[in-house]
C-alpha cells in the first residue's frame, strides 16, 4: 500500500548540514529580532517590576525573600544590565512575614524612584532574557532532529517555536515562564538521550540541566519523581524486547543441539553471563540516575548560595493548609512541628520551600474570581488551560499538530501490517518506539494535569507554556510527508 508523500527535489537541501545550519541561524536571528523589537514597544507587565527588583536584591544582599514563589535564575540574568547601567534604589517597602508578598509594592517603588528611565531599564533587562528563548528553540531543533532522524523535522519544530505567539509574548519579558519552557525541555531532552545511551558524561549533563530547570520554576520539582518512574518503564520495555528477541528462532542457521552435557552446560554459562552483564548494567544506570538527581539538587542549592539549605522541617512557618494542617489557608503553622519528620533536614533552599508553600496557599484560597468566556466565578474550570491553549495558539500550528497524529497513525498501521515488523513508527527513523514518545510526552502531560487540577483559581495560560515546546518537537514527525517517493521494484 502506498501512502501519499510529497516528492519535491528541493527538499533534499535539508540533507545538507551547512544549509540546515544557515536556516537555523536565520530563524534564531529573526526570533531574537522580534523579541528585541517587542521589548522596546510594550510597557512593563504587572509582574515585571517585582521580578526585576527581586534580581537586584539577589545580587546586592544575597537574599531571596522577594518573589520567593519563583526561583532566582531569571532574576539574576535580568538584573545584570540594570546593575551595569545604574539605578536608583528604594528598599523601604521590604518586609517579611509568613505569606508576605512585598515584591509588588517594591516594584512600584522602583518605578517611582527611577521615573521615565525605568522604561529603559526594563528594556535592557528584557534583552538580557532573550537567550532563554533562543536556547529553547535550539533544544526544539536538536530533539526533533534526533528523534525523527531528519534535519527537516528539526527545522519544522524550530520554526513553530520561533513564531509561536505565546513564546514571542513571554520571551520578551522579565518573567520566568519562557526560561522554564526552555530549560525544562532541555532537561527532558538530555534525560531521553541518557536513557538511550547511558554514560557518566551524559548523566553529568542531565544533572546540571535539571538543576538549571529547577532554578527557573518550581513546577519542575516533579521531575525528581517522574524520571525514576520513566527509567523503570524504559527498563521494562528493554526486558520485553530481549524476551521477544530470544523467542525468535534463527532462520538462516541450523538449530543448535541441546542434547548432551557439554551443550547444556555451554548454554547455561552463556545465559548466566548475560544475566550478570544485564544486572551490572542496571546497577550502573541506577547509580547514574541517583547521581543525576543529586547533581540537580546540588545545582539548585548552589543557585541560592545554599541559603537556608538543610533547615529542619519543623523550623519552617508555613501558610498553606497542605503544610500547616489547619482549616484555613493563610494561617501560619507547621503540621510537622511535633512529629518525627520535623527533625529531618530539608535538602532544598529555605526560600524555595517557602515559595512552594506560598504558591500552594494561592491554589487553596485565592481572593480574586476567575474568568472564562463571559463568566466570572470563584474557583476554576478543569478545562480552562486546554481551552486557553486552543484559542491562543495559531490555527496553522494546530493543523500541523493534527497532521502529526495522522502521520503517527498512518505509520503505526504501516509498521503493524508489515510481516515480521516490530511496532516501529517511521521507516526512516526506525529507532523511534513507544517509549521514546513516552519520554517526550510524560512531563508536559503531567504538568498539564497538575495545573488543571488546581481548581481554586484559573489565571494565565503561561502556567502551561512549557507544554508547547514538547508539542512542537512532536510536530517534527510531519517531515516524513516530504520524503522522496520510493518506487516499488518487482
Predicted regions and their residues:
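Membrane-interface transmembrane helices that cradle and orient dolichyl/undecaprenyl
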Residues: 187-203, 232-238, 242, 247
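Signature aromatic-anchored transmembrane alpha helix within multi-pass, membrane-resident enzymes
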Residues: 25, 225-228, 289-298, 414, ...
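Hydrophobic, aromatic-rich transmembrane alpha-helices
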Residues: 393-430, 487-488
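Specific aromatic-rich, kink-prone transmembrane helix
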Residues: 139-143, 179-196, 209-210, 470-477
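Interfacial juxtamembrane loops and adjacent helix segments
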Residues: 65-128, 312-379
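Short helix- or helix-capping micro-motifs
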Residues: 27-28, 157-162, 189, 210, ...
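Transmembrane-helix motifs of polytopic, lipid-linked glycan transferases
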Residues: 127-147, 186, 190, 406-413
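Transmembrane-helix signature of polytopic, membrane-embedded enzymes
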Residues: 20-25, 92-108, 140-163, 196-205, ...
Amino acid at each position: 500500500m502506498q501512502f501519499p508523500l510529497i516528492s519535491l527535489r528541493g527538499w533534499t537541501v535539508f540533507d545538507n548540514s551547512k544549509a540546515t545550519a544557515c536556516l537555523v541561524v536565520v530563524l534564531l536571528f529573526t526570533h531574537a529580532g522580534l523579541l528585541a523589537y517587542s521589548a522596546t514597544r510594550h510597557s512593563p507587565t504587572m509582574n515585571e517590576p517585582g521580578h526585576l527588583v527581586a534580581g537586584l536584591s539577589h545580587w546586592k544582599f544575597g537574599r531571596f525573600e522577594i518573589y520567593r514563589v519563583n526561583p532566582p535564575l531569571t532574576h539574576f540574568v535580568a538584573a545584570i544590565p540594570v546593575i551595569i547601567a545604574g539605578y536608583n534604589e528604594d528598599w523601604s517597602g521590604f518586609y517579611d512575614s509568613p505569606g508576605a508578598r512585598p515584591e509588588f509594592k517594591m516594584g512600584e517603588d522602583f518605578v517611582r524612584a527611577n521615573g521615565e528611565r525605568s522604561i529603559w531599564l526594563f528594556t535592557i533587562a528584557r534583552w538580557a532574557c532573550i537567550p532563554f528563548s533562543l536556547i529553547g528553540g535550539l533544544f526544539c531543533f536538536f530533539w526533533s532532529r534526533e528523534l525523527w532522524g531528519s534535519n527537516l523535522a528539526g527545522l519544522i519544530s524550530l520554526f513553530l517555536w520561533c513564531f509561536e505567539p505565546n513564546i514571542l509574548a513571554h520571551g520578551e519579558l522579565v518573567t520566568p515562564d519562557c526560561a522554564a519552557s526552555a530549560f525544562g525541555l532541555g532537561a527532558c531532552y538530555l534525560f531521553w538521550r541518557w536513557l538511550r545511551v547511558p554514560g557518566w558524561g551524559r548523566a553529568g549533563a542531565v544533572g546540571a540541566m535539571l538543576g538549571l530547570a529547577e532554578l527557573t520554576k518550581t513546577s519542575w520539582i516533579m521531575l525528581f519523581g517522574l524520571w525514576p518512574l520513566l527509567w523503570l518503564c524504559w527498563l521494562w520495555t528493554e526486558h520485553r524486547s530481549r524476551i521477544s528477541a530470544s523467542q525468535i528462532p534463527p532462520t538462516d542457521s541450523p538449530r543448535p543441539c541441546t542434547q548432551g552435557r557439554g551443550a547444556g552446560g555451554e548454554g547455561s554459562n552463556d545465559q548466566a553471563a548475560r544475566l550478570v552483564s544485564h544486572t551490572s548494567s542496571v546497577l550502573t544506570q541506577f547509580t547514574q540516575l541517583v547521581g543525576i538527581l543529586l547533581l540537580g539538587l546540588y545545582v539548585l542549592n548552589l543557585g541560592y548560595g545554599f541559603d537556608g539549605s538543610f533547615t529542619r522541617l519543623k523550623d519552617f512557618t508555613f501558610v498553606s493548609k497542605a503544610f500547616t494542617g489547619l482549616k484555613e489557608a493563610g494561617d501560619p503553622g507547621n503540621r510537622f512541628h511535633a512529629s518525627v519528620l520535623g527533625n529531618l533536614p530539608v535538602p532544598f533552599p529555605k526560600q524555595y520551600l517557602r515559595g512552594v508553600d506560598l504558591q500552594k496557599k494561592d491554589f487553596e484560597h485565592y481572593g480574586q474570581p476567575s474568568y472564562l468566556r463571559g463568566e466570572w466565578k470563584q474557583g476554576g474550570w478543569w478545562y480552562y488551560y486546554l481551552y486557553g491553549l486552543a484559542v491562543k495558539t495559531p490555527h496553522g500550528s494546530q493543523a500541523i499538530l493534527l497532521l502529526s497524529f495522522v502521520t503517527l497513525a498512518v505509520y503505526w498501521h504501516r509498521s503493524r501490517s508489515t510481516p515480521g515488523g516490530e511496532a516501529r513508527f517511521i521507516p526512516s527513523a526506525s529507532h523511534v518506539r513507544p517509549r521514546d514518545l513516552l519520554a517526550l510526552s510524560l512531563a508536559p502531560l503531567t504538568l498539564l494535569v497538575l495545573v488543571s487540577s488546581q481548581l481554586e483559581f484559573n489565571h494565565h495560560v503561561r502556567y502551561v507554556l512549557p507544554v508547547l515546546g514538547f508539542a512542537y518537537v512532536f510536530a517534527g514527525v510531519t517531515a516524513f510527508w516530504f520524503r522522496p517517493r520510493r518506487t516499488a521494484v518487482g
